[in-house]
Swiss-Prot record:
GO terms for cellular component: cytoplasm. One of its GO terms (molecular function) is 3-phosphoshikimate 1-carboxyvinyltransferase activity. It is found in: Cytoplasm. It comes from Salmonella newport (strain SL254). Its EC number is 2.5.1.19. This is 3-phosphoshikimate 1-carboxyvinyltransferase. One of its GO terms (biological process) is amino acid biosynthetic process. Monomer. The gene is aroA. Keywords: Amino-acid biosynthesis, Aromatic amino acid biosynthesis, Cytoplasm, Transferase.
Amino acid sequence: MESLTLQPIARVDGAINLPGSKSVSNRALLLAALACGKTVLTNLLDSDDVRHMLNALSALGINYTLSADRTRCDITGNGGALRAPGALELFLGNAGTAMRPLAAALCLGQNEIVLTGEPRMKERPIGHLVDSLRQGGANIDYLEQENYPPLRLRGGFTGGDIEVDGSVSSQFLTALLMTAPLAPEDTIIRVKGELVSKPYIDITLNLMKTFGVEIANHHYQQFVVKGGQQYHSPGRYLVEGDASSASYFLAAGAIKGGTVKVTGIGRKSMQGDIRFADVLEKMGATITWGDDFIACTRGELHAIDMDMNHIPDAAMTIATTALFAKGTTTLRNIYNWRVKETDRLFAMATELRKVGAEVEEGHDYIRITPPAKLQHADIGTYNDHRMAMCFSLVALSDTPVTILDPKCTAKTFPDYFEQLARMSTPA
């Protein structure tokens, strides 16, 4: 297996313009494909997840052109539901941001479509979304294991009264919200359970509004969506930088700054993960906000005990930042780490112990006490981009760290390690 050893880093300083947000890129691509008119998307993320979405749209007859660096996409919308040219199988890798929204949107058509992916995708639950789509008339079969992909879709979604479980993934609600305006009937979506990652729903609603569709949101417990609508292209749309990707650089600034400035997001950003900066501030770092930047300056870091439900992806970065904080850090209400690219709670606990931390792993929390001195270890990344990037921070100590399968960062940030090296002064 390929590996990358990062030597100790004495200081991190400088600015980075972030690649586009994965969450925003794939939502914008799907809405542009469903919309009337041509959309020019700029600062699109070039990553595995986005390539899977683009390949699927192409197979569904959507025409687009990409710039040489794949960050600009000119896409001609379908002016309504996506239609398969006959029976079709779409392979979506491990891209949850493609699988969930497409599973819903493709229930508006008539043809038979199979959605599948790599082995980990077949372990990521989708039953709650399928249950909701069936309530709206969709005809869906599980081809292997009940409640998991692969799925066979045969259209039939018309809207109506629908319940969705919000406790596992906000992507299920996102998928229903984006699909419902194109259904023939009005849709009322009721959310049961505590809605996880609520800020991701704000991203969805914000983008839908940009494409000309507004819906009634009653305290995130009920959404009323008029049927028979159309999305309309906004013309040009700039994808904001990925706030989850910003977390590694901001954390590096907190631990070993100088000052690190990330551009492409700021106080006006629609991504909930910008709140990560507030957590670093609570831990002792100094944060400066601009409209399109966030800067972080080193501080004396101390442990925190916090509910992280609102920033589940960026919260992983706090788990490795905790290695540099005084005291025991507890991250709570993070059950949905278990249904991501890997079981992130188990993975994080396992790898933190390798570098010497004392870790308590609960059903939905993790408690981390740093060692007096970090140990050099080979870090397993579980084919999870965030594990690789989180554990790069270990090199901000006086100990090297070896990252196994470093190229897994291609899911959201193909040149992550090059960018980190560019801003780092070796010890």
